[in-house]
Amino acid sequence: PRSTLFPYTTLFRSETQNYARLMQILSDAQENQLWMAITGSAGSGKTFACKQYSRDHQEVFYVSCDPDWTKREFFSVMLRKIGKEPSGLTLIQMKQKLVLQMRCLESPIIILDEADKLSDVVLNSFITLYNDIQYDCGVVMIATEFLFKRFDTGVRFNKKGFNELWSRIGRKCVP
């Protein structure tokens, strides 16, 4: 029952459950090199939980996505996250360096917060990335429900790469 003095008791309990659930999903994804998408409402605590998970665990690379990134900018950010300098490298060399580094780690995970903000071109680059590191690294895309809508629309209208990417994350978004 809700208190009239403190009407948000249910909300905080719900957020705590969301937090615990998301932490467990991230742990499973990291331990088992899972590729998945998780969606939730704005303000549901996704970002907080992901940042906390990245602080509490090793080999976690948290990235807050930007809608203006090109593929080159995305891979530059990824290399910097793993402590490598992208200067002077071609896009192919950046991808190769990221793949090699992920393969050298025991159980890495990349958390892409606000993944729904990434351009189609950047999202499509995950198809080959998946092919290269699917057994070496987990990748979790975190977003609002708009990510599911993008995948759904992309698959229904046969947009380049969406069916392949959708299959690589198990043809679902975890709500």
Please provide the spans of the model-predicted regions.
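Short, small-residue-biased leader/transition segments that mark boundaries at the very start
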Residues: 4-11
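Pre-Walker A adenine-sensing motif
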Residues: 15-30
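Walker A/P-loop nucleotide-binding motif
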Residues: 30-52, 66-67
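Sensor-1/coupling segment of RecA-like P-loop NTPase cores
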Residues: 35-42, 118, 130-160
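Short hydrophobic/aromatic beta-strand immediately N-terminal to the Walker A/P-loop
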Residues: 35-39, 61, 111
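Conserved catalytic segments around the Walker B and adjacent sensor/switch elements
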Residues: 57-67
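A short helix-turn-beta junction within AAA+ P-loop NTPase domains corresponding to the substrate/partner-engaging
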Residues: 58-60, 155-175
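Mid-core helix/loop region of P-loop NTP-binding domains shared across ATPases and GTPases
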Residues: 70-77, 85-125, 131-138, 160-161, ...
